[in-house]
């Protein structure tokens, strides 16, 4: 049934214009971070020591912001980003631990560095390194997926009609 269906450009455009929220690419942030580990259940002495180390690293960053990546390589305890100078790449909301994400999305300009923040993993220093604003994906980029969706929807409707017709025919006999 679906192979026989043709969806017109006007129908595709109408769907795109009627539901722009479905075709938005969420804002993303690129950040680097330095993690000084102090797991959630760590004792007070471990937490105090980790906070002090994070504060000392932040002081070095404030003295020379260009050293962030170098300081991340030397001090961060995040195995996934340390070798990359703390770079976490671009991420949307919902992809990182809440404290880190809220801080990254709370920074207002590229190059801005946060104060020391705490998460379940320890203490972080976040540097905002990029922002991709929310955008409406271009029609040409989503045209084929809208067409496929409209075809599936129409095929399901036609299939239901055929089943009803078949059921009625069988019932009448």
Region roles according to the model:
Residues 113-119:
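Short acidic-hydrophobic surface loop/beta-edge motif
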Residues 1-5, 17-63, 73-99, 125-170:
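Well-structured core secondary-structure elements of compact alpha/beta domains
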Residues 96-109:
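Cell-wall glycan
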Residues 105, 168-173:
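Short terminal targeting/anchoring segments
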Residues 12-15:
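Append "and occasionally in soluble cytosolic enzymes with long acidic Gly/Pro-rich linkers
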């Amino acid at each position: 049934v679906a192979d026989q269906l043709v969806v017109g450009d006007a129908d595709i455009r109408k769907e795109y214009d009627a539901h722009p929220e479905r075709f938005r690419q969420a804002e993303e942030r690129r950040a680097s971070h330095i993690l000084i580990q102090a797991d959630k259940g760590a004792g007070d002495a471990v937490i105090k020591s980790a906070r002090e180390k994070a504060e000392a690293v932040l002081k070095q960053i404030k003295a020379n912001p260009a050293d962030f990546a170098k300081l991340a390589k030397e001090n961060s305890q995040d195995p996934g980003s340390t070798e990359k100078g703390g770079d976490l790449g671009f991420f949307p909301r919902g992809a990182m631990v809440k404290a880190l994400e809220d801080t990254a999305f709370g920074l207002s300009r590229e190059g801005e560095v946060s104060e020391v923040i705490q998460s379940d993993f320890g203490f972080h220093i976040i540097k905002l390194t990029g922002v991709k604003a929310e955008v409406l994906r271009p029609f040409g980029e989503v045209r084929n997926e809208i067409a496929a969706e409209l075809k599936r929807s129409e095929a399901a409707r036609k299939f239901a009609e055929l089943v009803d017709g078949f059921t009625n025919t069988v019932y009448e006999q």
